[in-house]
Amino acid sequence: MKNLSENANVDTKTMPAADVHLTLTKAVKYQFGNLMLILRDDNGNSVQVTLKSTELKPGEYSKDQMSSAYVTISGGGSYRNLDSDDPGSFTVKYDEGTGIYIIEGVLILQPNASYPSVNVVRFEYVGAI
């Protein structure tokens, strides 16, 4: 293995610790005054976020930009609300040339006695919306 400085085309970044990592494969958005974004996979996992905006723009979304959100995790609880003090955040990137979004983040769930080991969810989505 070469020294890190000798490796070309390698990006490294520190990822926050998470209890669950979801690679979501489907996305839809709805406009009901505010924007609702739903990301899900074929295993019943999903992230649903209602934003305090009418458009999904590139940038970071945290407590101030989210009006409500919940996460459903197969084997980890349905409709798990986010922590009201620190719900976590996610980042949206968009490539206008390809129409592809990259959405990734870490959400912190309210504690749940039925699922005490699932409190932090890291997720990512790459695709069109």
Language-model features: locations:
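An extracellular/secretory-lumen and virion-surface interaction module
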Residues: 1-129
